[in-house]
């Protein structure tokens, strides 16, 4: 994916139905996944200014970008309709896709780059770190509210933008294949870690089977539930809307809950080499669970609430499986900074899994009390 020139960006902007002419283009972010620009326009007849988020979607990661955009349009329009019914802010409460002048939600340029545009959400900020249980509870409430607003949307209408993303059963099968291949000749040095995972093989089908049987309902899932994907009001610090919707797809609410717990209820970074510093933090789990359930406003089933601890456990185990599998394959998927990086990552996740197992009775008792 090549970075565009300023002239190319202006050409693309002219294809979209923007208000006024472009007067400023500012790069935003590090371009790790998508190239992003903040574009300012001005209407000459009234000197009104508007801002837009203009992006190139990384089609190396998202192979079917039209499906990604259809998902985003479905979800944001559903949320906006609910905001409108309730008399809430339809401009800031969810992302607004800007269409091209010929009525499409994207534009592909001569270089094959796939462009999209959102209205910029004004007077908001992003924060990167969770510094307290209270902050984590607010993150939980925001993502719980996302579930609530989409609880009456038919998730089966969405495409699976990354197939089998949280199919832990398949992730485990892929891991066993990596062990058998031993492509990098590393399996002999990680037998303890391999055994830890294989001893928990039956756990991998827990959520997948519950979805298949109907024990858990199919829901819209965000799949990247971190603080930086919540826009906060710059004055009140209250959550305004959820962003980064590229991985929105059908799944279980436990996936989103578990993804937050895996990182937010850990005492250290996922690549902390000193395992004595790595602990699961029950108080952070409890804070997030309270916020999440409050945000859902009763949209979760009793079974979903009771299985919230399983969400944190399974997603953490799944990530350990992925890290260790990539280590065995010779680090072909995750970017690494040193030869043992993926192994270090896997070990932190396995330490969290072990800690969660020890805390599981306490966690189950806590969520049962929230029903």
Segments predicted by a language model, with ranges:
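Amphipathic alpha-helical segments that form well-ordered structural scaffolds
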Residues: 11-12, 78, 145, 196-203, ...
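Secondary-structure capping and boundary motifs in well-ordered enzyme cores
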Residues: 110, 135, 217-222, 249, ...
């Amino acid at each position: 994916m090549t970075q565009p020139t300023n002239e190319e960006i202006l050409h693309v902007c002219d294809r979209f139905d923007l208000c006024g002419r472009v007067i400023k283009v500012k790069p935003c972010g590090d371009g790790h996944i998508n190239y992003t620009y903040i574009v300012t326009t001005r209407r000459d007849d009234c000197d009104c200014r508007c801002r837009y988020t203009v992006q190139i979607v990384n089609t190396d990661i998202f192979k079917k970008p039209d499906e990604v955009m259809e998902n985003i349009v479905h979800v944001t329009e559903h949320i906006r309709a609910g905001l409108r019914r309730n008399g809430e802010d339809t401009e800031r409460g969810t992302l607004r896709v800007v269409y091209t002048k010929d009525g499409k939600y994207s534009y592909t340029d001569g270089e094959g780059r796939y462009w999209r545009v959102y209205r910029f959400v004004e007077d908001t900020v992003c924060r990167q770190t969770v510094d307290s249980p209270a902050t984590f509870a607010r993150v939980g409430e925001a993502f719980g509210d996302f579930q609530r607003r989409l609880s009456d949307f038919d998730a089966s209408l969405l495409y699976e933008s990354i197939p089998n993303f949280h199919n832990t059963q398949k992730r485990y099968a892929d891991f066993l294949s990596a062990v058998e291949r031993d492509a990098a000749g590393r399996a002999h040095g990680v037998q303890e870690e391999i055994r830890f995972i294989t001893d928990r093989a039956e756990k991998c089908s827990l959520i997948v089977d519950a979805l298949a049987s109907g024990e858990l309902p199919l829901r819209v899932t965000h799949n990247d539930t971190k603080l930086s994907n919540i826009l906060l009001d710059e004055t009140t610090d209250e959550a305004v809307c959820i962003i980064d919707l590229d991985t929105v797809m059908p799944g279980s609410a436990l996936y989103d809950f578990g993804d937050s717990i895996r990182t937010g209820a850990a005492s250290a970074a996922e690549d902390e080499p000193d395992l004595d510093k790595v602990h699961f933090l029950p108080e952070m789990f409890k804070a997030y669970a309270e916020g999440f359930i409050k945000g859902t406003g009763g949209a979760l089933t009793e079974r979903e609430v009771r299985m919230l601890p399983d969400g944190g456990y399974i997603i953490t185990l799944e990530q350990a499986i992925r890290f260790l599998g990539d280590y065995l394959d010779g680090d072909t998927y995750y970017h690494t900074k040193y030869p043992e990086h993926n192994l270090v990552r896997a070990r932190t996740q396995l330490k969290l899994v072990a800690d969660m197992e020890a805390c599981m009775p306490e966690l189950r008792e806590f969520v049962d009390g929230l029903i």
